[in-house]
Amino acid sequence: MSMINRKIIFTGPVGAGKTTAIAAISDIRPITTDEYASDMTKSRKPQTTVAMDYGLIRLSENERVHLYGTSGQERFDFMWDILTKGGIGLILLLDNTRKDPFQDIRFYTNAFRDFIEKQQMVVGVTRMDLQRKPGLADYRHYLESLSLQAPVFDVDARSHRDVTMLIQALLFSLDPG
């Protein structure tokens, strides 16, 4: 029996939880390209992803899901097209404590527009325990105003259960049957 390999992309702004989410769910120790932050990113976290993160989930003996996390910094956007090749879907993580998370939605949905027009997207909002507004309904309405439909969840990127829920929602949206 041949191996089935699937690829899911995690994206979002610096500090939204991409590296943490992949580490929470991966069956292997994630491969990261974190470096010490040297720009305005330093105010959000001491290290930042400069190329990608990689993790792996073994669903069965012959089925794997490869997890790729993008850098949240725009200057590394040349990697984004490379990482989406062969991907089945996008998980957009948003930090609810950022100044304008709707600007983050605009930016990332525009940057990945070609990909999400062909594939599915799921949105996970982190740090809602620290900042309740905007709420999940606000995110859904904003996505609809951009002519986008995607499930939106309140998630803790450190939680295996929450990240599993995002992946299951993405896989279900691909094949609800």
Sequence positions of predicted segments:
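Inter-motif core of Ras-like GTPase G domains
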Residues: 76-98, 112-116
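Canonical P-loop GTPase G-domain recognition
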Residues: 129-177
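Conserved beta-strand/loop subsegment of P-loop NTPase cores
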Residues: 89-93, 116-127, 146-155
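Conserved catalytic network of the ASCE P-loop NTPase/AAA+ motor domain
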Residues: 2, 49, 58-60, 82-86, ...
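Conserved G1/Walker A P-loop phosphate-binding module
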Residues: 1-46, 56-58, 66
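Acidic beta-to-alpha connecting loop that harbors the catalytic carboxylate
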Residues: 97, 127-130
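Switch II (G3) loop of P-loop NTPases
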Residues: 59-77
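Charged helix-capping and loop-helix junction motifs
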Residues: 105-109, 136-138
